[in-house]
C-alpha cells in the first residue's frame, strides 16, 4: 500500500482548521449570509438588465415596423373594418326602430279592428232582424 500523501493530509487539516476558525469568528454565519445576499442582488440586477434589454429590443422592432408602415397599414385596415361594422350596426338599429314603430301601429289597430268586427256583427244582426 502506498503511504498517504503528506500534502493532501495537511490541506484537508488546514481546511478543517480554517472552517473551525471561521465558525468561531462568525458563529451565526453573517459573513456567508452577506455574501449570499450580495450574490442574490447581483443576480436580480442581472435579470432586470436582461429584461430591460429584451424590452428595448422589442420596442425598437415595433418602432421599425411602424416606421416601415407595416403595422400602420394593418391598423388602418382594422379601423376601416370597424367603421363598416359600426355602419351596419347603425343600420340594424334603424331597422329595429322601424319595427318598434310598426308594432306600435299594429297595437293601435287591434282595438280598432275589434270595434269594427263588433259593429259589423251588430249591423248584421240588425239587418237580419229587419228582413
Curated annotation (Swiss-Prot):
**BP terms from Gene Ontology:** endosome organization
Leader sequence segment? none
Q: Enumerate the residue ranges of region (Disordered).
A: 1-29
- Coiled coil, from the record: 73-101
Indicate where this protein resides in the cell. Cytoplasm
Q: Give the function comment from the record.
A: Component of the biogenesis of lysosome-related organelles complex-1 (BLOC-1), a complex that is involved in endosomal cargo sorting.
Q: Report what the protein is called.
A: Biogenesis of lysosome-related organelles complex 1 subunit CNL1
Q: Which organism is it from?
A: Lachancea thermotolerans (strain ATCC 56472 / CBS 6340 / NRRL Y-8284) (Yeast)
What's the encoding gene here? CLN1
